Every structure is written in C-alpha cells, then in structure tokens.
Amino acid sequence: MQFNSYGFILFVLPVTVLLYFLANKIKPVFGKLVIIIASIIFYSWGRINMLLYLGISLLINYGSALVIKKRKIRNRMVLALPIIVNVGMLVYFKYLNFAISNINAFLGKNFPFQNIILPLGISFYTFQQIAYVVATEQGELENNDLIDYLAYILYFPKLVMGPIIDPVDYISQLNQAERKKVDLTNLAVGIKIFSLGLLKKVLIADTFATAVSWAYTNIDAATSMDCLLLVLFYTFEIYFDFSGYSDMAVGISSMLNIDLPMNFDSPYKAVSIRDFWKRWHISLTKFLTKYIYIPLGGSRKGEAFTYLNTLIVFFGKRIMARG
C-alpha cells in the first residue's frame, strides 16, 4: 500500500487515526495495538509474503535484545552477533546478485543469479533493529516491552522509506500521556504537511517520472539535449519522490502526536558536496554518524582514519539507497 493510494487516504489513514485515539481512551496499550495492526495491514497489503522475512527479523532482534538485557555485564561480542546477522542479511538481499554479476565478468564464469525478492523497506527496518539492540546494550531503554518494540519497528509511517528515529525518542513519545489525546493543532499541521508531501509526489515526482520513463524507452533516438534533460529530470524525480514520501510520513505522525524528524533541507540549494550531504536524508546521516562514524573514532584518530571512517559511512549510505 502507498501513501498516495485512494484506499490509504480515504480509508486506512482516517480509520487508523480515529481508532488510535479511541483505543487510547480505553487503555493506552490498545492504542499501541492499533498502530501495530495498522502497520501490518499497510506493509502486507498485496504482498503478504513480505511478512515472512520481517517476522524472522523481529524474532532474531527482539530475542537478542532480551539476551543482552539479562546479562548484567556488557559484552561487545553479544552485541556484535545480531549486528552481523542484520548487516549480513541486508547485503545478501541487496547485493548478492550484484556480486555474482561482477564475479562472472571478472573470472569469465557463468554462476547463476539467485531468485531473490527484496523485502520492502529492509534497509530502514534493519538499521532501526540495530539501533534498538544497541540502545538495549547501552542501557538507554528502561525495559524491553514487546508491544513498544513492535510499535517502534513496525510503525507504518516510517517503515518503508523512513525517516529513521531513535528508539528511545519514539518509545518515550509513545508513552507520554499528553500525546494520547487528540491535538487539533497537531492534526491540522499533520494534514498540511501530508498534503504538501502528496503534491510533491503526485504532481511533481510522478510527472518527472513519466518523462524519464519515456526517455529511457526511446534512449536510442535521444539527442544530447534529451540526455541532459533526462539527467536533470531524474534528479528532480528522486528528490521529490523521496522528500514527498518523508513529508507524508511526518504529516501522518503529527496527526498521531508523534514527532518524526524532517529528512530533507532543500539539498539542491547546497553550495558544496559536504553541505549536500548534511541536507539529504538527514536522519540516515545522523544514524550513521552515531552508530558507525563515532564508534570508529570519527575524526579523533588522525587524517587517514577520518577519511577511512567517512568512506565507510559513505558506503553505509549507499547500502541504504532505494530502501
């Protein structure tokens, strides 16, 4: 299901918002269950097979978090195992066939490609699984409540394309009593942000996508000017599609009294590559800085390690590309 589909806008979204606040009036945990159920419906709509790997991921990571929580002494090896499993599965789904293609080209072999179906949103929920496990190991979470965990990982506004939010921040908001009641200001702001994101997606991104699709279809007859326009249109398609989706996610969350971080800050106004990096997919940059760049030493270990750490973060951002 997509945010810009009629079924979501006219049925799933209003019903979820209504049931969420009604359920909170009965008992707070019921509101969380509404989010979990709505998220499962949203994710599995038309592709129920996607739930299999997501379910396996949930079992592995929540089980790992419980094991880590029960150990009184912090152990890096216990933490490393679920991280290795998460990253390994992510690389398997996204890059195995890419690796096979390069091996075949380099060695002149003909190893068969694997029939791999990429789970929707795997990059986003995998990285947030890592964030949850790390937060548990560092003692940032007071408890590892199963309902809170599921509501965090499955939260449908961010499940497929982000933005990424820290588990401590999200779970804290989810449990604040004042956020469980309808806030008309947040509702109005949420509708506004969602509408702007919808316009970005439907009127701008999809229009450029049509032009890009036509250009690729007729690429053999394309002139130099056509190719230049293709590059330009594609950059706008990517930005407005991703930015529009993120805006819609932020808008939906505002309706539910949850604050998600803004993900883009006019990146095409950047005056340098470094400035662009800071403006594009902001939540991912913060995640990679916190969980990769700083633990590796950041810029504290000399110029060579600074460049190496930056390169590792760059590849981390590349792995996240296309969800």
Per-range role (PLM):
Residues 1-323:
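Membrane-embedded transmembrane alpha-helical bundles that form the catalytic cores
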